[in-house]
């Protein structure tokens, strides 16, 4: 009689009892094989999994970080400390022991002198905690060196000078003026390319990055607009289209390129007000007065044409609108008004009607047919008017036409009889 086994299909192993199988299901080896099975990979054995686990633990121990994300600095063992205790040769002779004690006493005297000098000198407050930790007696149980802090990964010689006053700290925190002068109005704001000229720079930003300057004809301060964009994007690292604030120049450039925000927001009233100092939408008084005079002349002419009850002039009335070259609507247009004063013909041939006749303009009346064409249609439909038809053929056609009419009437009668009982609440009085 064969004994029963409990099998794990994921790890391809067998167990004698169900308890062992349940315990196996909770192990990391089984979970790892489950993930491999989901990824369509074959399972691995326990020995191979143990090797992978040791490698991962070793990597984690080497790449340890503290709570702030900085790597944990481990002490570097000296060559003497790196050797095991068995390899160190013990001092057996009495002379050697005396030399060792003399060296320790001399070391203690040097340490005492150094402490005295530190207490007298004014630089005692600058001494770090690491220097205090390295000073110790022979009974101090430590693996670190006594004179340097190179065990922590630092060098004894430092190339940096520490700022001791508040003014030096403020100067160190403030960005240098050279960084602000890196971008000029001839350089691209979004990639930093130097185009040598302002107009070439604007064309480059429009073609490569999509920077469109709205209402360019009213722009009076292009250099000021570019300086404003440099201040907002390059110096302050702010996006004009959203509230994103970049950590640096490359950060804000990458954001604006990925989000397609290399443009000027000019849709709402608040956004237009932001760029208002660089535009001028006012006209000189001469052009304004000339436009008013032209408008009044056109209005009076049209009112006289539309309001006239009896037309004394023959032909059409031509109105020519010629404006000055400096006007915003500088063009030459000729329009024609018919005798009724309700239609205006454009140079393209299109006709514009007065709103008083919109009821008639909306009608879609069919055109009058040509009498010759209508006569031909009747002739083609009635074969009696065609030459060459005999009386016998005519009578035969009449009989056939009458038969078709009779069949159509009978079909209609049959359909009407069937539809009588289609009523919802129909009650036949004869059947009651």
Curated annotation (Swiss-Prot):
Write out the GO MF terms.
zinc ion binding
Would you tell me the Gene Ontology cellular component terms?
cytoplasm; preribosome, large subunit precursor
Q: Where is the composition biased (Basic residues)?
A: 86-98
Which biological processes are named by the entry's GO terms? ribosomal large subunit biogenesis
The segments annotated as C2H2-type zinc fingers are 6-30, 186-209, 237-261
Q: Which Pfam families match?
A: zf-C2H2_2
The ranges of region (Disordered) come to 79-150
Per UniProt, the ranges with Basic and acidic residues bias are 105-117
Q: Which PROSITE patterns does the entry mention?
A: ZINC_FINGER_C2H2_1 (PS00028)
The protein's UniProt keywords, in alphabetical order, are: Cytoplasm, Metal-binding, Repeat, Ribosome biogenesis, Zinc, Zinc-finger
Location relative to the cell:
Cytoplasm
Compositionally biased tracts (Polar residues)? 118-143
Q: Give the protein's function.
A: Pre-60S-associated cytoplasmic factor involved in the cytoplasmic maturation of the 60S subunit. May act redundantly with REI1 to directly promote a stabilizing structural rearrangement in cytoplasmic 60S subunit maturation independent on the REI1-specific ARX1 recycling.
**Subunit info?**
Associates with nascent pre-60S particles that have not yet entered the translating pool, and is released from mature 60S subunits. Interacts with pre-60S factors NMD3, LSG1, and TIF6.
Other facts = Present with 2240 molecules/cell in log phase SD medium.
- Family designation: Belongs to the REI1 family.
- Record-given protein name: Cytoplasmic 60S subunit biogenesis factor REH1
Organism the protein comes from? Saccharomyces cerevisiae (strain ATCC 204508 / S288c) (Baker's yeast)
Cite the source lineage.
Answer: Eukaryota, Fungi, Dikarya, Ascomycota, Saccharomycotina
The gene is REH1
């Amino acid at each position: 009689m064969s004994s029963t086994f409990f099998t794990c299909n994921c790890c391809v192993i067998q167990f004698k009892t169900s308890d062992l199988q349940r315990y196996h299901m909770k192990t990391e080896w089984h979970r790892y094989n489950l993930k491999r099975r989901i990824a369509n990979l074959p399972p691995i054995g326990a020995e191979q999994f143990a090797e992978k686990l040791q490698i991962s633990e070793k990597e984690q121990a080497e790449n340890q970080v503290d709570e702030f994300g900085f790597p944990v600095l481990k002490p570097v063992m000296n060559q003497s400390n790196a050797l095991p205790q068995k390899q160190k040769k013990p001092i057996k002779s009495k002379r050697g022991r005396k030399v060792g004690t003399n060296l320790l006493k001399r070391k203690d005297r040097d340490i005492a002198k150094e402490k005295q000098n530190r207490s007298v000198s004014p630089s005692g407050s600058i001494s770090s905690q690491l220097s205090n930790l390295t000073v110790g007696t022979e009974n101090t149980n430590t693996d670190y060196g006594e004179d340097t802090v190179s065990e922590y990964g630092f060098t004894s010689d430092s190339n940096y000078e520490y700022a001791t006053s508040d003014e030096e700290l403020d100067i160190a925190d403030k960005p240098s003026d050279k960084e602000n002068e890196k971008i000029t109005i001839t350089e691209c704001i979004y990639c930093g390319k130097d185009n040598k000229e302002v107009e070439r720079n604007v064309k480059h930003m429009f073609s490569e990055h999509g920077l469109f300057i709205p209402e360019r004809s009213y722009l009076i301060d292009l250099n000021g607009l570019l300086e404003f964009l440099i201040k907002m994007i390059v110096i302050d690292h702010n996006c004009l289209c959203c509230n994103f604030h970049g950590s640096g120049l490359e950060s804000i450039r990458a954001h604006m390129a990925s989000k397609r925000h290399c443009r000027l927001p000019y849709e709402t009233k608040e956004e237009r007000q932001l760029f208002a100092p660089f535009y001028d939408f006012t006209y000189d008084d001469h052009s304004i007065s000339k436009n008013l005079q032209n408008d009044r002349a056109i209005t009076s002419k049209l009112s006289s044409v539309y309001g006239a009850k009896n037309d004394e002039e023959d032909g059409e009335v031509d109105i020519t609108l010629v404006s000055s070259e400096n006007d915003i609507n500088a063009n030459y247009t000729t329009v024609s008004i018919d005798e009724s004063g309700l239609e205006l013909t454009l140079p393209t041939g299109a006709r514009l009607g007065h709103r008083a006749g919109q009821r008639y303009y909306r009608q879609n009346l069919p055109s009058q047919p040509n009498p010759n064409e209508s006569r031909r249609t009747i002739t083609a439909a009635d074969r009696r008017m065609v030459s060459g038809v005999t009386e016998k053929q005519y009578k035969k056609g009449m009989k056939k036409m009458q038969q078709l009419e009779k069949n159509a009437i009978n079909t209609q009668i049959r359909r009407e009889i069937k539809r009588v009982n289609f009523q919802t609440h129909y009650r036949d009085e004869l059947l009651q």
